[in-house]
Each structure stands twice: as C-alpha cells, then as structure tokens.
Regions:
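Alpha-helical scaffold segments that flank or form the walls of functional sites
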Residues: 1-46, 66-75
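Conserved, mostly hydrophobic/aromatic
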Residues: 24, 42, 83, 113, ...
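Metal-coordinating catalytic core of metallo-dependent amide/deamination hydrolases
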Residues: 37-152
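Histidine/acidic-residue-rich catalytic or RNA/ligand-binding cores of hydrolases
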Residues: 118-130, 158-163, 180-189, 206-223, ...
C-alpha cells in the first residue's frame, strides 16, 4: 500500500465499483488512504459512497480528518463523510481524544475496527483497563451514534453500550474466516435489538466483493456458532445486507422502496438456472 500512487488508488476504486455492481451493491462504506483519489473515482462514476477516516498513528491527522469531513460532505449528494479512526491498537490517546472532540463539534457518528481479534481486546485492556467499546464510550465518541466493524470479541458491557447508544455492528464473515479472527456473536446482537449490517472488508482480507456470498456466510456461521439452524431468520439477514447497512451509513433515504425515498435498487433475473424453481 505504501507504494500506491494517487492514480493507482483512483483506478483500483473504479475496479472495485465495477465489482460491487456485479453483485448488486449500490453504495459502499469506505475507510482507506489517499481519500481524495477515492472520492474522485466515486464522483466520476456516480456511485454512492460514504467515507470514513482511517486516522491512526501513521496516517493522517485530526486536521486532515476535519478537512475531509467538510470537503466530502459538501461535494455531492452521493458522497458523505463520517468521522472515524482505524482502530484503538493503532491510534494513540491524544488522537482518540481529538476524534471525540470532532464528534462533539459536528454531532457526527464515529466508526472504527472494533474487537476484531482476541489479542486486540486483550491489548486494549492492558493499556486502558477497558475494552475498545468501553474506551470509546468513556471518551464520549458515541454521543451521536456510529459503531464498529467486526465486533467479534465482545463483553457483556459492550453489548449494553451498543444497545443503549443505538450503534451498529458490521460483520465481515469472509474476512474473519480468512484471517482466523473468530465468528461474530450475531445472534446476541440480534436478540438485543442492535442494528446489524454485513460488509465485505477490503480486498486484502477477502479477495471478493460479493454481497450474496457474505449473506450466505453470515447466516451459516451464526448457525454453527449457536448450533441452531433456526437462530436468525433469513429475512433478518436480508435486512442486514440492505436496510441495516443503509442505517449504518446514515443513508436513511435509501433504506427501503417507498415514496420519497431514493431509488437505490437492483434487479435479479429469476429466469437464471440457479433461481429456479421459484416455489422453493
């Protein structure tokens, strides 16, 4: 990644958008470097994109984060920006505090990689005496919502914070399998009424941007984790892949087909062999 030039990031974003469209993805939630090149690709294609910052000890600064927040949110009606940082284990205390201050200033949700690995959570508890979720709560980052990507190694108090703050957990099953991170406790989120969404994660940790594959893995892994084939209904999984994601990205005008909503929709050809017979 350190060798990627601006043009590389631009054209790789174009390639990613093309792959998104092949599996019916109408918008993406992107945390990456060289974001002005990423946003140029989405503006040129007209693809709906929500960016969030990957701020950490090695990339960007609070000043760049604030600049991008104001720039992208005024750029187009198909682009928006939410505050965020890469992860607790890559981001020092002063930077975390700066994100919390910006969240208060702009009344913005905050996003980060959260409890993806067991070692990540253990390290955070050694440094702060808290899990990543509890640390963000103490710093005041969740006053205006947000959530976390992965959310595998969660504790009881973490679930309470997600429920009470109306946060979203984004599960990334292919990535979690490839990196042997663990399996998201999806049913516990679901039973607590916490909003859930499904993500693909990045190409380095997935190799594929196929939402239908992610839906299958999301339901399959949850069933195995709970040893319950009926643990989460299929319509709930579909909700996570559609409206759940829209709510996570603050795209509340794209969450369902209704009068006055944006017409973000896909068509599925029911005449293809894999879609027959329709009755079962």
């Amino acid at each position: 990644e350190a060798k990627l030039a601006g043009d590389d990031v631009y054209w790789l974003n174009i390639l990613g958008i093309m792959e998104y469209l092949t599996s019916g993805i109408t918008s993406n939630f992107d945390m990456y470097i060289q974001q002005k090149n990423s946003i140029a690709a989405t503006v040129d294609t007209g693809f709906r994109t929500v960016l969030t910052s990957g701020l950490n000890n090695f990339v960007d600064s609070p000043e760049i984060l604030e600049e991008m927040y104001n720039y992208v949110n005024k750029l187009s009606d198909r682009t928006s920006y939410l505050l965020g940082f890469h992860a607790e284990y890559t981001t020092g205390g002063p930077l975390l505090e700066s994100v919390a201050k910006l969240a208060e200033k702009y009344h913005s949700p905050v996003w980060t990689h959260n409890a993806e690995t067991k070692s990540e959570v253990e390290g955070c508890k050694e440094r702060w005496g808290l899990t990543p979720t509890q640390l963000m709560e103490r710093l005041g980052m969740f006053q205006y919502g947000g959530g976390g990507y992965h959310c595998i190694w969660m504790e009881d108090r973490d679930f309470e914070i997600f429920r009470d703050r109306k946060l979203t957990a984004v599960t990334n099953p292919s990535s979690n399998l490839k990196l042997a991170s663990g399996i998201c406790p999806l049913k516990r989120f679901y039973d607590n009424g916490i909003n859930l969404a499904i993500g693909t994660d990045g190409p380095a940790s997935n190799n594929c941007l196929d939402m239908f594959r992610e839906m299958f893995l999301t339901t399959g892994l949850s069933k195995v984790r709970e040893m319950d084939a009926a643990g989460i209904p299929a319509d709930a999984i579909l909700y996570m892949a559609t409206a759940g994601g829209a709510h996570a990205m603050q795209l509340t005008d794209c969450d369902r087909l209704a009068a006055g909503k944006k017409a973000d929709l896909v068509m599925i050809d029911l005449h293809q062999p894999n879609m027959q017979p329709e009755n079962n």
